[in-house]
């Protein structure tokens, strides 16, 4: 996602009136709401003093709804109707949920997004999330004693357009005015930067319940600049829980657990993982539905062993982000740890070993994102800040369109600071072409087949012209929430078509991995493939133009000359079929040479036609 915020935008017409605005961390495991009071950001607790709200919703009998701790207490007894970690389902289909088989839910693969069957009917992740947001809204309004002006809601940096739009829809359903969606690492940077006055280059390592986000941030005299982002939208604390869950099943010899057992053991797995944050070992006890009694000991060494591959996997986006920012680990001034999963000692040790320094943990990793969001919300609501500050965020993946030959033309490159608008002119490929299909793409590769398709739309009503004469301006705009709109406009006639890109499905793990790692692994191969495709497109254009010219003015050539041109055309076709860049370029050059005399004669004829019937004085 991306954000460009300068000083105090949208100042209130009543500058001395404090508007009630909050920051919301809509988390996978827990959610929080925070606000700015007397110049300081603080998390708003519930009536019993608890800051965290478990991101759990239960749909009970007779329409009774429970959110948070009340729902969490019932998750083992009523697993089908108690939805946990719904954030992982936002903007995704069933095929995108890698551990769907081990979850106790009844999924419906509806168009656009997976849905869940509950006692209260079929619920979408948007509806479930809205229930969590509504509970946070009610908590905030009760604590602040008034109606909220709006909220800044945080999302993982690697949430795509579908997931971001789903988050905004959930907020609107909950009755919240969304001031802005804010990347979670960026929110953490705001909290650390403004609270500590830090300067230098920092890494924000955000390992939450369901996602990993890594951001490289440069902080200089109140200016926050995001140099690069990377991450994994399906790697988080839940995956560590799942490894412990599988270990428990294996140790107990359970091969076909019931829904009750799955939920119970998932809960015990999470509790054991959290206990090992402060203890060397912990006991796991449970009574399964068949009466089997479970009593196992889990120590830190075992937890480390069964989750080592996950910890190692978290460092891959770290390396990618550093490479994108062109910064070495030793150039980092500090590492900010965000997210409850970063409490695990072996995660902290792995990060410390990689950077050669202990990470920063002076703010509560569970609260830091909400605190940063609250500071941002306070500014957007028009409340006065003592210090002006500037925040520059970036787009994590390049955006572009498909051009002839199946090539990707990047309009906005990755790591561009946004909000941003970029335009580029394109033209027609065929004579008399009156429509153009616009295929919007996301990714770093050169070929369309290796990028992610976001949307397609068609511009119609282009005036018939010779190939290359029309001018179609394609404009990409990415707003402050990272949502994309694309407009195509034919310059002479003014005909226009546009689309807002809201993909039906989120990125799968494989797609994310392919986009962010294969783009580097296949650089040379992609360059060569692009050269060949470009050569073929040029050759086909030259071939078609030559054949059209022969059809119109072939009488300008004698039999031998025509045979030479036709042989050159055939050579181009043969080279295209052969698929060797050098051969295609050579054949195109030979065809250009063979048609030089023909082109000169056609030009003379056209001049004679234009001058016929005119006097010199008319010219």
Swiss-Prot record:
- The domain of life for this entry's organism is Bacteria
Q: What is this protein called?
A: Chaperone protein HscA homolog
Q: Which PROSITE patterns match?
A: HSP70_1, HSP70_2, HSP70_3
Identify the InterPro entries for this entry.
Answer: ATPase_NBD, Heat_shock_70_CS, HscA_NBD, HSP70_C_sf, HSP70_peptide-bd_sf, Hsp_70_fam, ISC_FeS_clus_asmbl_HscA
Tell me if NADP is a UniProt keyword of this record. Answer: no
Q: Which gene encodes it?
A: hscA
Q: What does this gene product do?
A: Chaperone involved in the maturation of iron-sulfur cluster-containing proteins. Has a low intrinsic ATPase activity which is markedly stimulated by HscB.
Pfam families for the chain:
HSP70
Record PANTHER family: HEAT SHOCK PROTEIN 70KDA
Alphabetically, which GO biological process terms does the record hold?
A: iron-sulfur cluster assembly
Family to which this protein belongs: Belongs to the heat shock protein 70 family.
Report whether Nucleotide-binding shows up as a keyword of the record: yes
Per UniProt, the keywords (alphabetical) are: ATP-binding, Chaperone, Nucleotide-binding
Mind telling me which NCBIfam families this protein's record contains? HscA, PRK05183.1
Which GO molecular function entries does the Swiss-Prot or TrEMBL record give? ATP binding; ATP hydrolysis activity; ATP-dependent protein folding chaperone; unfolded protein binding
Name the source organism: Chromobacterium violaceum (strain ATCC 12472 / DSM 30191 / JCM 1249 / CCUG 213 / NBRC 12614 / NCIMB 9131 / NCTC 9757 / MK)
